[in-house]
Regions:
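Solvent-exposed interaction patches of small proteins and small membrane subunits
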Residues: 1-113
Length: 113
């Protein structure tokens, strides 16, 4: 089983990939199906990694909506055709920046422990 620090790094790697794929803006995202699929895939990775974190660690960082992250992953995996591109874009723009900042802090604090 992978350690929590590795799962957190998986999350950061996925966020970095999403940032690269979406750097050209909303219009490019809307026009490029491959980018849409790749972004959704990386959101799935984030949800999978979050799902593997211990309850203790998630409780220490309760400001993160862990349950929503995992729930979105479940929708992506099991009900893919319900995924709204507007919602995906909103997650990328509004939710990933604070998640990235918190996960970076988590990695740093775990490294210091």
């Amino acid at each position: 089983m992978r350690r929590e620090a590795e799962r957190l790094q998986d999350m950061l790697d996925a966020i970095s990939a999403i940032e690269r794929y979406t750097s050209q803006g909303r219009q490019a995202f809307d026009e490029q199906e491959l980018v849409q699929v790749w972004v959704v895939h990386h959101l799935q990775i984030i949800g999978e990694a979050a799902n593997s974190l211990s309850a203790d660690l998630m409780n220490q960082y309760a400001e993160v909506p862990w349950a929503q992250i995992v729930a979105f992953r479940n929708i992506v995996v099991h009900e893919y055709f319900r995924v709204s591109l507007n919602l995906v874009w909103a997650i990328v723009q509004n939710n990933l920046p604070p998640l990235k900042a918190t996960v970076e802090r988590m990695v740093q604090e775990l490294g210091e422990a």
